[in-house]
Amino acid sequence: MIIRSPEPEVKILVDRDPIKTSFEEWAKPGHFSRTIAKGPDTTTWIWNLHADAHDFDSHTNDLEEISRKVFSAHFGQLSIIFLWLSGMYFHGARFSNYEAWLSDPTHIGPSAQVVWPIVGQEILNGDVGGGFRGIQITSGFFQIWRASGITSELQLYCTAIGALVFAALMLFAGWFHYHKAAPKLAWFQDVESMLNHHLAGLLGLGSLSWAGHQVHVSLPINQFLNAGVDPKEIPLPHEFILNRDLLAQLYPSFAEGATPFFTLNWSKYAEFLTFRGGLDPVTGGLWLTDIAHHHLAIAILFLIAGHMYRTNWGIGHGIKDILEAHKGPFTGQGHKGLYEILTTSWHAQLSLNLAMLGSLTIVVAHHMYSMPPYPYLATDYGTQLSLFTHHMWIGGFLIVGAAAHAAIFMVRDYDPTTRYNDLLDRVLRHRDAIISHLNWVCIFLGFHSFGLYIHNDTMSALGRPQDMFSDTAIQLQPVFAQWIQNTHALAPAATAPGATASTSLTWGGGDLVAVGGKVALLPIPLGTADFLVHHIHAFTIHVTVLILLKGVLFARSSRLIPDKANLGFRFPCDGPGRGGTCQVSAWDHVFLGLFWMYNAISVVIFHFSWKMQSDVWGSISDQGVVTHITGGNFAQSSITINGWLRDFLWAQASQVIQSYGSSLSAYGLFFLGAHFVWAFSLMFLFSGRGYWQELIESIVWAHNKLKVAPATQPRALSIVQGRAVGVTHYLLGGIATTWAFFLARIIAVG
C-alpha cells in the first residue's frame, strides 16, 4: 500500500469582480474623501485634492485595497512609459536624421526634432551635418539604436507601434487587475514567489533574451556597420536569426550550433563572447562582444538566484527564517520582526527600494562615461554630459524619496509596542548619539573642506602662490584614489590574466582611444584639485544624510514634541501657544533635505563638466597631440572659489549668454526663464502666510466692490503648501538653468 502525502491545495489568489467599473466617480472630484467630496468652500480645496488623490493610505485602512490600488497604478505608470518610449522611437522614425547619422556618426550630429517656421523659429534648426537642419539631441537614443542593430527608420516605426500596443495592454492590465481579477493580500505578501519570479523571470530571462538578441542580431549588424557597409546592404535581423550560415560567415563557430555548449567545449564561443576590456577603437564604445558575454553571465546568475526561495515544494530559503537568524553578539534581536514590517508596510518596502535604486542610478551615471556602452557615445560630448547630469539628479531625488517614505513608515506603520531590542528599536534608542556624531562630522567636513579653498583664495589674493594647496606648491595628492586607479590599470595580465585591457581607460596605463579626431577616453589624472572638491562632495552628502536621517529617527517623537506621531507626517507647528515648534515635521525634513541634495548634486555635475573638458575631452592631431577643450586648466583654477566663479561659471556661461540670434538661442531663453522660475520660488520661501492673507483680503474687498467676487473664498496657501510650491520652483528653476548652461556650452565647443 502506498501512503501519499495530501496534495497541497491550490490557493485561490484573486477575487473575481470585486469593484464594478463605473465612470460616475470620475465626475465627482475627491470621491475618495468625505471632506473633499463636498466640494470647494475655499481655494484650499484644490490643494487638498491634489495632496490626497494618490495618498491611498488616507482613503482606506484596508491593506488589501491599498495594495490593489498601488498594483493597478503601477500598470498605469508602465503604460505611460511605453507611450513615452513610443514617442521617442516615432520621432526617430519621422523627424530624425538617423539613417544619415548611421552612415557617418563622426561628422553628423544626432537630431530628431525640427522646429516649424512660424515667426522666425526656424533659427533653432541648426546644421547638424549632412545637410540636415534640426535641433541637436543629447539623449543617446541614436547610439542605443545602433548598438541594438536598428538600421532603418522603418524599424523604428515598427518598434514605435509595438510600444503603443504594449501601452494599451498595460492600461488594460491595470483595469483588469483592479476590477475583474484583483489579487488577494496573501498574493502581495508571498515574497518567496515574488523573488523567484522577479529574479529568474525579469532579470534572468530578461538578460538572457537580451544576450540572445545581441549575439544573433546586434553583433553581426554592428560588425558590418563598423566595416563601413551601407546600412541598406546589411541583411535584416530576421535573416540572421533564421539563416545560420549568414552568422557563420562572420563567426565560424556558429556553424557548430549548440554542440560546443553541450559538450562543454565553451571556448569555441570565444569569438563572440569575449573578455577583452577597454574600448573598441572604431566606435569608442565597449566591445559589444564583451557586453553580450556580460548579459549571458548575468542571466545565469539570476536564473540560479530565482530558484533559491521556498515556495510550493518546501525546499529553499524562507525570507522570514533568514531575517530572524540574522543577529550578531551586539545586535540584540537583530532583524526579528523585519519580515512583518516589510510585508505589511509598503512605505518601508518602497523606502529600501528607493535607496537602492537611487544609489544604483548614481552608479550608472559614473559608468556611462568611464565605460561608455554604446558605439559613438564617448565622442558625443553633449550626450555624455547630459547622461551624467540626468542620472545624478534622478539618483538624488530617489534617495530623498527613500527618506520621505521611511519617515512615513515611522509615522503611519511603525508599532513601538511590538518592537523590542531589534535593530530598528536599538537605532531609535541611540538616535541622539547617531545624530550628534553625524552633526560633528558635518561641521568638521564643512570647515575643513571649505577652509582649504578659503586658504587658497587668501594666498592667491595676497600674491603668495607658493603657499597655496596645489600640485605645484603644497601638494595634497589623493593617494588612496591613485592607488585604486593604479591597481586597476595593472590588473590585465596580473590579477585579471584573461583580460587584454583594464575595465576602464580612466584608470591609467597610457592608452588613449580617439574616434574621428576626437578623444573618446583617456586616463584621468587625479590631483590636489580633485582632493579638495571631493571633500566638498563628502561635506554636502553628509549634511543631506544628517537632515534626512534626523527626519526619520525623530519622525514619531522628540524631546521638543514627545507626541509627534499623533500630529502626522506633515504639520506646520505643534499648535498655538507652543512657539518654536514650527518646521519640525518629518515632511519638513524632506523639504530641507531637498535643498542639500540640490547642493550636493550641483557640485558633482560642475566638477564632472569642468574636469572632463579640461583633462579628457578634446581633439587629437595627426601627430597624436591632444588639445583639451579648456586646455587642462582644472588643476590650477579649481583650487580657489574665485577660480570656480571666474574660469568655470563665468567663462563657460559665455556660450549661453551669447546664444541669441543663433540656433542655440532657445538655451539662452531657457537660461533666462529658468532663472526667473528659480527667483519666483524665493517669494514662497521667504514670506509668511499672514502677509498673503492680508493682501488677498484687500483684493477680495475690491472684487466685492465691483460685485465680481467668486463663490469660492480665496485663501492664502498653508505653510506647508507654500513651502512645497517654493521648493518645487527652486529645484525646477535651478535644474533647468544648469541644463541650459551645460548644453549651450557643450554643443558650441564639443
From Swiss-Prot:
Q: Where does [4Fe-4S] cluster bind?
A: 573, 582
One GO CC term, this protein: photosystem I
For this UniProt record, the keywords arranged alphabetically read as follows: 4Fe-4S, Chlorophyll, Chloroplast, Chromophore, Electron transport, Iron, Iron-sulfur, Magnesium, Membrane, Metal-binding, Oxidoreductase, Photosynthesis, Photosystem I, Plastid, Thylakoid, Transmembrane, Transmembrane helix, Transport
GO biological process terms held by the UniProt record: photosynthesis
Q: Cite the EC number.
A: 1.97.1.12
Q: Which PROSITE patterns match?
A: PHOTOSYSTEM_I_PSAAB
Chain residues that bind chlorophyll a': 675
Query: What does the Swiss-Prot or TrEMBL cofactor note state?
Result: P700 is a chlorophyll a/chlorophyll a' dimer, A0 is one or more chlorophyll a, A1 is one or both phylloquinones and FX is a shared 4Fe-4S iron-sulfur center.
Domain of life, per UniProt, equals: Eukaryota
- Which segments cross the bilayer? 70-93, 156-179, 195-219, 291-309, 346-369, 385-411, 433-455, 531-549, 589-610, 664-686, 724-744
Q: According to its UniProt record, where is this protein mainly located?
A: plastid
Record: residues binding phylloquinone: 692
> What is the membrane topology noted in the UniProt record heading this document?
Multi-pass membrane protein
Where can this protein be found?
Plastid, Chloroplast thylakoid membrane
Molecular function terms from GO? 4 iron, 4 sulfur cluster binding; chlorophyll binding; electron transfer activity; magnesium ion binding; oxidoreductase activity
Q: Which residues bind chlorophyll a?
A: 683, 691
Which reactions is this enzyme annotated as catalysing? reduced [plastocyanin] + hnu + oxidized [2Fe-2S]-[ferredoxin] = oxidized [plastocyanin] + reduced [2Fe-2S]-[ferredoxin]
Checking HAMAP family in the record gives: PSI_PsaA
Q: How does it assemble?
A: The PsaA/B heterodimer binds the P700 chlorophyll special pair and subsequent electron acceptors. PSI consists of a core antenna complex that captures photons, and an electron transfer chain that converts photonic excitation into a charge separation. The eukaryotic PSI reaction center is composed of at least 11 subunits.
Q: What is the purpose of this protein?
A: PsaA and PsaB bind P700, the primary electron donor of photosystem I (PSI), as well as the electron acceptors A0, A1 and FX. PSI is a plastocyanin-ferredoxin oxidoreductase, converting photonic excitation into a charge separation, which transfers an electron from the donor P700 chlorophyll pair to the spectroscopically characterized acceptors A0, A1, FX, FA and FB in turn. Oxidized P700 is reduced on the lumenal side of the thylakoid membrane by plastocyanin.
Which PANTHER family does UniProt cross-reference here?
Answer: OUTER MEMBRANE PROTEIN, OMPA-RELATED, PHOTOSYSTEM I P700 CHLOROPHYLL A APOPROTEIN A1-RELATED
Q: What is this protein called?
A: Photosystem I P700 chlorophyll a apoprotein A1
Source species: Eucalyptus globulus subsp. globulus (Tasmanian blue gum)
- Species lineage: Eukaryota, Viridiplantae, Streptophyta, Embryophyta, Tracheophyta
Which gene codes for it? psaA
